[in-house]
Amino acid sequence: MAGFTYATLTTAIQNYTEVDTNVLTATITDQFIDNAEMRILRDIPLDAYKKQSIGNLVTGQNTINVPAKTLFVKGVQVYTSTTAATGANTWLEKKDESFLQEYVPSTESTKRAIPKYYAMFGGATGITDTTSGTLLLSPTPDNTYEFKIHYEAIPTGLSGSNTTTYVSQYFGNGL
């Protein structure tokens, strides 16, 4: 099946439902399209939207913001280096927030070490890095280690102003 543009997909939806734009308004059609795209993105992690974000942990701070427009976090690496995201590193294990709070319940300096675990909480609107959620780390970092977040990004959806997307071109039958 060939891919869709915004215009061809909205026409196909109207033809399938046998109603015109007086009943099936652009607002309703756009919501159908958005829901279908999000379902595809959640169910099929696409290489086209794999992203990485690199930064430095803050000594004594056990949270970091998830990058803006994150659909979900695939993994977190912490490097033993404080200056480069290369070399020796550890993949953090995802756990529930309650596990992390029991594992090391304190952020005091004697309990700090290179993190081993992370948990997701809060946010989840995906609009900015302060509303995309937060990662809780345990134990709390004892140094400014370099970290890399591997995540699936939320792409710009199909719309009247964005007439084609990777999903509309290669997963048209899912829409």
Q: Predicted regions span which residues?
A:
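Glycine-enriched, solvent-exposed interface loops adjoining structured elements
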Residues: M1-L175
